[in-house]
Amino acid sequence: LLGGAELNVAIGVQRLGHTTEYVSRLGADPLGGYAKKQILEHGVGTTFVTEDADNWTGFQLKQMVTTGDPQTFNYRTGSAAAHLSADVLDDVKLDDVKIAHMSGIFPALSETSNQAFRHLMDRLVAADKLITFDPNLRPALWNDDERMIREINEFAKSADIILPGMNEGKILMGSEDPKDIADFYLNQSDRTKVVIVKVGPAGAYVQTRDAEGFMVPGFKVNNVVDTVGAGDGFALGVITALLEDKSLRSAAMRGNAVGALQVQTPGDNDGYPTPAKLKAFYEAEGVSED
């Protein structure tokens, strides 16, 4: 199955009718060839997916479950993506970028990928591109919790919109309270204008720099099959709504909706909707975007 946080978002954004480009590096091996073919079949651009003849394609093993959270095992250390260097990212064209979605997973892969991530962040900031950032904490990849916390919070300073989870907030700044989490990130950087905190089935808390925060309730799911991909679904819901000039309330509601649809399927991104499926879901729930 094709997956991975950033790619999940790209697939879901594409499925909702928007153009996406994925930035990564694959090995010159059968797994890399299969992955690139699948990425293209999902309609995601691969202009900036490069091939590495010397290193292998990273992968993940995921336990198949009938409900809840599966165990996952990452095999990415030493992979082609872990060798993606900053100079390669100079070839990434930013002119047509409307929103750049960044995740805290890639900089955890290696020192090389960490520097590449910083370089791309700096380029995006210099080009004044809107950056969404999902901390996507993976302690097993960092192997150093203090460094993970320090660097994820530093990366967040470059983001316009930050999408942490409530549990991530507890690790990153010591509180599970959505308002405390939002205040922390709004106060640490003038660039950050919006923080949307994922609070699980309860929904999401939205806070801007110049207005009172508010909750956007989640949708009830009677049968949770697999939770992997729900957070990425939330991110792509927010991103696509903003691309369509929807309000922040609608963006959070769409994020909640996509997350709810995703947890009802076994794959990492199988539940991400088309526009028609999203419309049908809203109609069944008796809600609409503004």
Residue ranges and their predicted role:
Residues 1, 8-19, 64, 240-244:
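Alpha-helix C-terminal capping segments
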Residues 7-21, 41, 184-188:
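A short, N-terminal amphipathic alpha-helix
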Residues 13, 165, 231:
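Short, conserved phosphate/pyrophosphate- and ester-handling motifs at nucleotide-, phospho-/glycolipid
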Residues 19-104, 279-290:
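Conserved N-terminal subdomain of the carbohydrate kinase-like
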Residues 92-93, 154-155, 188:
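Structural alpha-helical scaffold elements that stabilize or flank donor/cofactor-binding regions
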Residues 99, 105-184, 202-203:
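Conserved beta-alpha-beta core of the PfkB/ribokinase-like small-molecule kinase fold
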Residues 122-123, 174, 178-290:
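Conserved phosphate-binding/catalytic region of the ribokinase-like
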